[in-house]
Curated annotation (Swiss-Prot):
It holds the Pfam family HlyIII. It is found in: Cell membrane. Residues 73-80, 135-141, 208-253, 316-330 are extracellular. It comes from Homo sapiens. GO terms for cellular component: plasma membrane. This is Membrane progestin receptor gamma. GO terms for molecular function: signaling receptor activity; steroid binding. Keywords: Cell membrane, Developmental protein, Differentiation, Lipid-binding, Membrane, Oogenesis, Receptor, Steroid-binding, Transmembrane, Transmembrane helix. The chain crosses the membrane at residues 52-72, 81-101, 114-134, 142-162, 187-207, 254-274, 295-315. Its main location: membrane. Residues 1-51, 102-113, 163-186, 275-294 are cytoplasmic. It comes from the Eukaryota. PANTHER family: ADIPOR/PROGESTIN RECEPTOR-RELATED, MEMBRANE PROGESTIN RECEPTOR GAMMA.
Length: 330
């Protein structure tokens, strides 16, 4: 019979510094794991196991919702629903890519960086999907058919390209300038989210307009709260920073961050679905639905330029002398 032995785990002082996580002392996988060992680690309690499953399981939930929406939509003729389908598709992509990144990030130093480059690209693709759905369904009455609305998605595309580049670049600073690395990475994700959310901020805190005063408002509020909590957890490394070694396997900040992000996405999806349904008559009377070329063009530009960023920075990994990128790893 075929027997598979679970890989050995390591402590923080047994692996190169590039694999270190703040406040996490034990449960590390071999820094040159095989693909098979990485897959087996899904069924072994390591410090990455729950990072993987907290996005892999939600991927199947969001995929089920996406397939259900596809089945119930007349895709060819219902252009009003296209932005929602694009958004739901991107909400499947980012948790899948994230779970794959966490699964295979221990294959080598460069593989770790490349895995997370792809992760950052997927997050930014989701950011663009959110912007497309917001533009189609959630904009407050006063901002519809304005210059801001006209250029909102175009600038969201630009934001995703810049954000992917900045977040990828930040990984080159991890060892030598960890604080600057963290600041750049947080800002790289914070400003696209802020741009995407401007119509929501206006709607919640200034003037929603008659058509936007509906049941979706509470979901938008919950989405914002969960996103702020996720941002705090990602930045603060709590609770493991206060008690190193106590939360290595269960309860560290990245696991909690994943849970908050998934809950935020769920709340966001419910809000957008409600806006799409409850505001349909008003929106169709006020503005034209996105054309296929507009949606496809935005998505393709995001994918092409984000992949270009990822390829450029991946190639740079092999051009930089090892002592420069990992010089403190001794």
């Amino acid at each position: 019979m075929l027997s598979l032995k679970l890989p050995r785990l390591f402590s923080i002082d047994q692996i190169p510094q590039v694999f270190h996580e703040q406040g996490i002392l034990f449960g590390y996988r071999h820094p040159q794991s095989s693909a098979t060992a990485c897959i087996l680690s899904l069924f072994q309690m390591t410090n990455e196991t729950l990072n993987i499953w907290t996005h892999l399981l939600p991927f199947w939930f969001f995929a089920w919702r996406f397939v259900t929406a596809l089945y119930m939509t007349d895709i060819k003729n219902d252009s009003y629903s296209w932005p929602m389908l694009v958004y739901m598709c991107t909400s499947c992509v980012y948790p899948l890519v994230s779970s794959c990144a966490h699964t295979f990030s221990s294959m080598s130093k460069n593989a770790r960086h490349i895995c997370y480059f792809l992760d950052y690209g997927a997050v930014n693709l989701f950011s663009l999907g959110s912007a497309i759905a917001y533009s189609a369904y959630t904009f407050p009455d006063a901002l519809m058919c304005t210059t801001f609305h006209d250029y909102y998605v175009a600038l969201a595309v630009l934001n995703t390209i810049l954000s992917t580049g900045l977040s990828c670049y930040s990984r080159f600073l991890e060892i030598q300038k960890p604080r600057l690395c963290k600041v750049i990475r947080v800002l790289a994700f914070a400003y696209p989210y802020t741009w995407d959310s401007l119509p929501i901020f206006y709607r919640l805190f200034l003037f929603p307009g008659e058509s936007a005063q509906n049941e979706a408002t509470s979901y938008h509020q919950k989405h914002m709260i969960m996103t702020l909590l996720a941002s705090f957890l990602y930045s603060a490394h709590l609770p493991e920073r206060l008690a190193p070694g106590r939360f290595d396997y269960i309860g560290h900040s990245h696991q909690l961050f994943h849970v908050c992000v998934i809950l935020a996405t769920h709340m966001q999806m419910e809000a957008i679905l409600l806006d799409k349904t409850l505001r349909k008559e008003w929106l169709l009377a006020t503005s034209k639905p996105f054309s296929f070329s507009q949606i496809a063009g935005a998505i393709l530009l995001c994918i092409i330029f984000s992949l270009s960023n990822i390829i450029y920075f991946s190639a740079a990994l092999y051009r930089i002398p090892k002592p420069e990128l990992h010089k403190k790893e001794t």
